[in-house]
């Protein structure tokens, strides 16, 4: 019975996302009949500020936000939190640095994907095709990692098998991405971002209660693990690691295709400016709260790492199970699942657009063979399904 209670909230959430995507498909029929590629891959450039902010934040966050990051924070302490703080400005920089410029260029050349911009800028089909191949190859690998991480967390928290979780949210994310397209992904991403924030708040409350309150938790950490309160964590967080991580997760993420394409999709300048502000607050809340939860979980899971499977990836699943009732644990699991599927859906759509729009349609265009809107629809849906499966 407890296992059923664990799975019900997540299943209900996934069905809600599927319903939203089906609704988006019905409301987008007219636009897709006019220009399927533009509506399916960038939502017809109609995203408002709130949805743009939430979809960018949800896409940037992943299962590591809930599992890997907090797990490392359990070992290192506040030093990992200080490292993670650079992620607060990511959305502001992505939309602020690339957003407006990429939007102006995309509208001028009628670009639908980032690779369209590369092809127009460098006049090189070879470069564009290579970029498409790289995107598909690495995005597929990333999607596998996301699914595996979420499925293992699902198994640890709910008691259901790894394959059950993988099949359940794997199939649903493929279906809703396929039928909803970019607009469906954007709206469901917004729901996922909200679910992540709610889940983190519940988990934080559960952790505080299980640990006897903030003062008791911090008293234990300061007494038993004082190194966790130091920025360098007594050598565990050297300056070189700070610099490399700040560059990697703060600067180098600016050009991620799945994030940059959001700059092609927004409605107007007002939407962009609103998204920069909202997105910064949201990603800051998700990243910092999740990492901080990892730190305070040290006051709940007080044993050595060998007691928890000798892996930091086991820390958060065990902490969730020990801190919350089965029902609330099932609610919390929505957060990591939402982080996973919001990332996977964006990667899936980007990979599909790379194959259909950037490679196949370009080859046909060079041969002066025009594809009908219906053909583009079938190829796009087919590519999304095949890549997802």
What name fits each language-model region?
Residues 121-129, 136, 356-389:
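Loop-to-transmembrane helix boundary motifs in multi-pass membrane proteins
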Residues 39-110, 241-253, 259-261, 265-305, ...:
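Membrane-interface helix-loop-helix modules in multi-pass membrane proteins
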Residues 16, 132-145, 195-208, 243-254, ...:
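Selective recognition of specific alpha-helical transmembrane segments in multi-pass small-molecule
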Residues 82-177, 245-250, 338-345:
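Helix-loop-helix module between adjacent transmembrane segments
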Residues 1, 72-78, 98-104, 149-157, ...:
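Membrane-water interface regions at transmembrane-helix termini and the short interhelical loops
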Residues 18-32, 96-99, 139-147, 151, ...:
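Hydrophobic alpha-helical segments and their helix-loop junctions in multi-pass secondary transporters
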Residues 45-50, 122-129, 158-168, 233-239, ...:
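Membrane-interfacial loop-to-helix junctions in multi-pass transporters
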Residues 1-67, 180, 205:
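Membrane-interface "cap" regions at the ends of multi-pass membrane proteins
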């Amino acid at each position: 019975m407890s296992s059923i209670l664990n799975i019900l909230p997540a299943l209900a959430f996934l069905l809600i996302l599927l319903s939203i995507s089906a609704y988006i498909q019905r409301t987008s029929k007219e636009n897709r009949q006019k220009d399927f590629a533009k509506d399916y891959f960038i939502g017809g450039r109609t995203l408002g500020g709130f949805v743009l902010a939430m979809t960018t934040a949800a896409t940037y966050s992943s299962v590591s936000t809930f599992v890997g990051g907090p797990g490392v924070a359990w070992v290192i302490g506040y030093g990992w939190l200080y490292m993670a703080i650079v992620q607060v400005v990511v959305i502001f920089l992505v939309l602020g640095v690339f957003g407006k410029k990429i939007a102006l260029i995309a509208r001028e050349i009628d670009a639908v994907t980032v690779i369209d911009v590369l092809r127009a800028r460098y006049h090189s089909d070879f470069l564009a095709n290579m970029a498409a191949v790289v995107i598909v190859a690495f995005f597929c690998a990333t999607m596998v990692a996301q699914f595996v991480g979420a499925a293992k967390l699902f198994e640890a928290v709910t008691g259901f098998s790894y394959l059950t979780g993988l099949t359940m949210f794997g199939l649903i994310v493929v279906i809703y991405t396929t039928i909803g397209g970019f607009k469906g992904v954007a709206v469901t991403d917004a729901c996922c971002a909200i679910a992540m924030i709610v889940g983190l708040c519940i988990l934080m409350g559960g952790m505080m209660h299980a640990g006897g309150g903030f003062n008791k938790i911090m008293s234990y950490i300061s007494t038993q693990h004082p190194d966790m309160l130091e920025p360098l964590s007594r050598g565990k967080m050297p300056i070189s690691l700070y610099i490399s991580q700040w560059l990697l997760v703060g600067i180098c993420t600016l050009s991620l295709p799945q994030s940059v394409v959001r700059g092609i999709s927004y409605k107007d300048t007002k939407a962009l400016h609103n998204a920069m502000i909202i997105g910064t607050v949201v990603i800051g809340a998700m990243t910092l709260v999740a990492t901080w939860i990892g730190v305070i979980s040290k006051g709940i899971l007080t044993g050595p790492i060998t007691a928890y499977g000798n892996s930091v990836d086991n820390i958060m699943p065990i902490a969730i199970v020990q801190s919350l009732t089965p029902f609330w644990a099932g609610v919390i699991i929505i957060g990591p699942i939402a982080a996973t599927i919001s990332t996977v859906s964006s990667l899936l759509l980007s990979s599909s657009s790379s194959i259909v729009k950037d490679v196949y349609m370009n080859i046909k265009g060079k041969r002066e063979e025009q594809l009908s809107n219906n053909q583009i629809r079938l190829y796009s849906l087919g590519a999304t399904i095949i890549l997802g499966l």
